[in-house]
């Protein structure tokens, strides 16, 4: 790069012509940093100096730590508050779906890292309602895909968006037709299918958005998976709604799902 002139650098693929005059100074700084730290790779941030200056100012003015303990948690809360869906419903759905993920770990066989992707998708699965209620799942997927969700790789953000979109009828073909389709393998799509199914089950268990079903107990034996529901009264609509996903469950996990409402004595 040092042996090129300005006109030659303007023709370098991937290098903005607006940066061709200052790129050498920037590269020199990065080169010194890598040499001083002994690092072998550099991960770039989507944020710039202006964001750093803002966070520094905000931290001092509001007396909050400048470094977040969980940057993904903070950024998804920002998105959730920005679009203001029914947060009680979103948080309840998240509680239910994480109970399934933990209780059926042997069944789905997924790494714990996917738990935070599922949690993010569940919290934000309804933000698309701000655009259109009837096709909100697709809009939620698009909004998650383009949101400032720090703490996720590009691939993880696509997976999170696909989970939120697929749980309510958006097929994987919608995502496979987009330019980022090459990010996801067939194995990724199988994972997304499992997580989208769990989110769909959780959504059906609060279909009336009243949190009537407050606790669930997922279980598994050799031939079936079980789901015991603890509710206030008889959640007839939710009990009916979950039936729509039983065939999807059997196709995905290869076992029947038995749903049982706990008796008053069990509660």
Give the ranges of each region predicted by the language model:
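Flexible glycine-/small-residue-rich
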Residues: 122, 229-231, 261
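Short, non-transmembrane amphipathic alpha-helical segments
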Residues: 237-257
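A short amphipathic beta-strand at an alpha->beta junction
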Residues: 253-267
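Short solvent-exposed loop/turn micro-motifs enriched in small/polar/acidic residues
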Residues: 209-212, 252
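Helical "lid/coupling" subdomains associated with nucleotide-phosphate turnover
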Residues: 1-201, 205-209, 216, 220-227, ...
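Short, surface-exposed beta-strand/loop "edge" segments at domain boundaries and coil↔beta transitions
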Residues: 233-237, 267
């Amino acid at each position: 790069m040092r042996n090129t002139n300005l006109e030659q650098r303007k023709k370098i693929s991937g290098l903005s012509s607006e940066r061709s005059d200052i790129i050498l100074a920037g590269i020199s700084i990065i080169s010194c940093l890598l040499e001083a730290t002994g690092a072998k790779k550099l991960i770039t941030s989507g944020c710039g100096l202006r964001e750093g200056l803002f966070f520094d100012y905000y931290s001092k003015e509001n007396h909050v730590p400048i470094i977040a303990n969980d940057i993904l948690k903070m950024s998804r809360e920002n998105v959730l508050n920005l679009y203001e869906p029914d947060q009680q419903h979103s948080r309840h759905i998240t509680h239910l779906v994480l109970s399934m993920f933990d209780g059926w770990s042997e069944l789905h066989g997924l790494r714990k890292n996917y738990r935070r992707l599922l949690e993010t998708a569940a919290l934000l699965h309804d933000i698309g309602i701000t655009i259109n209620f009837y096709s909100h799942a697709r809009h939620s997927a698009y909004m998650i895909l383009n949101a400032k969700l720090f703490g996720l790789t590009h691939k993880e953000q696509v997976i999170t968006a696909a989970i939120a979109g697929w749980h309510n009828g958006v097929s994987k073909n919608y995502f496979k037709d987009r330019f980022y389709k090459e990010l996801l393998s067939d194995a990724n799509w199988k994972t997304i299918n499992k997580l989208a199914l769990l989110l769909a089950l959780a959504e059906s268990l609060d279909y009336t958005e009243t949190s009537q079903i407050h606790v669930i107990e997922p279980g598994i034996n050799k031939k079936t998976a079980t789901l015991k529901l603890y509710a206030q009264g008889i959640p007839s609509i939710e009990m009916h709604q979950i039936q729509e996903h039983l065939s999807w469950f059997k196709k995905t996990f290869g076992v029947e799902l038995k749903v049982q409402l706990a008796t008053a004595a069990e509660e």
